[in-house]
Amino acid sequence: GPYKNLRWMPTGGVNAKNLMDYLSFDKIIACGGTWMVKADLIEEGNWDEITRLTREAVTNMLGFTVKHIGINAANEDEALKAAKTFEALFGMACAVGNSSIFSGDKEIEIMKKPGRGTHGHIAIGTNTLDRAIAHLKLRGVAFDETSRTEKNGRTTLIYLTDEICGFAVHLVQK
């Protein structure tokens, strides 16, 4: 079409249930809607409810979930031993990769040598990584830009600068 370089911000017909349908389209930059800021809430001055609804929309849009926990092992033998322990105790089959061994449905990643983080890392998945980065930056979170990986012009992985309790944290696109 004639407007292939434009990005849009729909506001009509958007609600909490279809928000992600809109945002999944790459031509949509943002969404708005009266479901977050209803006229009666404004008239009542119910700013707490407006704030709650808006935060709920942002939380749903970002959809943060734990994707996996990474554990730093000293070496490949220790990593394999740990993976076999998860398999024996919990039935989590292990899959050996080049730099790590995954257990279960990739919920646990055991590094074959110490990696990022004092103890390891935590991968947090999000529905929309570039929006998550922008949101967290506004909240004062710093990112290690040297860790950013991209595919087709979109970020697929990035580490936060600071560890949390000895764990590096990285965001990944779901």
Go through the PLM ranges and name each one:
Residues G1-L6, T51-M61:
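Alpha-helix-loop-beta-strand connector modules within alpha/beta enzyme cores
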Residues T51-R52, I108-K112, K137-K174:
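Vicinal oxygen chelate
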Residues D21-Y22, E56, H135:
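Well-formed, non-transmembrane alpha-helical positions, independent of function
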Residues K27-I50:
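Glycine-rich phosphate-binding active-site loops on the catalytic face of alpha/beta enzymes
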Residues G1-K4, V14-I29:
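Catalytic cores of alpha/beta
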Residues V58-A83, G117-I124:
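N-terminal beta-strand motif that seeds the catalytic metal site of vicinal oxygen chelate
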Residues G70-E109, R131-A134, L138, E150-N152, ...:
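Core segments of cupin and vicinal oxygen chelate
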Residues L6-G12, I29-G33, I69, I122:
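Hydrophobic faces of well-ordered beta-strands that scaffold small-molecule active sites
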